[in-house]
Amino acid sequence: MKRSASDSPLLFDIPLAPDFSEEKRLLARGLKHIVGIDEAGRGPLAGPVVAAAVVLDIDNLPNGLDDSKRLTAVKREALYETILEKAITVSVASLSARSIDASDIRKAALEAMRRASVGLTLQPCHALIDGRDVPPGLPCPGSALVKGDQRSVSIAAASIVAKVTRDRMMIRAGAAHPPYGLEIHAGYATVKHRAAIETTGPVPGIHRYTFAPIKGRYSV
């Protein structure tokens, strides 16, 4: 069963859970290795943007794949381990808060996705990317899929790997910078996080100085 376009502002159907339809269309054209690419961390005030690229084994797909945002942390962690075990190849890349400030978040996210794709241990035949943009410099042709993490199991797997990787990074950042609670909110603009910035100020290398409410009020 699928949600219809009437349930969505988008002009296509979205399955209740990601499936292998997009990959099957490419496989039918003789394209063997399909890589799913997604990122985590576009919106937070702190921390890196992390991208993952995953080539799944069509004969050994993990069960329960879904958009990482629709899964509990416990389920994401379990699926993360399963993906690493069952996937043909997985690659992760990140760009720091400083790199984001030096460019912009859109360009940084696309660059992280490109770096993840070129880090794979095999040459993919086609990339499925979550969102509206195909990152420049991919090692293969690519297709951008709006809501791709809800449509494609390959992108869903990448979303889980990116999210878990970034959450673990933010847990370590939280231990190093206790006042901000980074391990709890992963750098998003919660009330506690904003209050800590007001009291203590942002941390160079951790916070994004080009993001409101930091932008224009603090300098590195």
UniProtKB/Swiss-Prot annotation:
Give the RNase H type-2 domain ranges.
Answer: 32-220
* Catalytic activity of the protein: Endonucleolytic cleavage to 5'-phosphomonoester
One biological process term in Gene Ontology: mismatch repair
- Name the keywords, alphabetized: Cytoplasm, Endonuclease, Hydrolase, Manganese, Metal-binding, Nuclease
Q: What class of enzyme is it?
A: hydrolase
SUPFAM superfamilies for the chain: Ribonuclease H-like
Please name the CDD domains in this protein's record. RNase_HII_bacteria_HII_like
The record's family statement is:
Belongs to the RNase HII family.
Please state what the protein is called. Answer: Ribonuclease HII
Question: What high-level taxonomic lineage is stated for the organism?
Answer: Bacteria, Pseudomonadati, Pseudomonadota, Alphaproteobacteria, Hyphomicrobiales
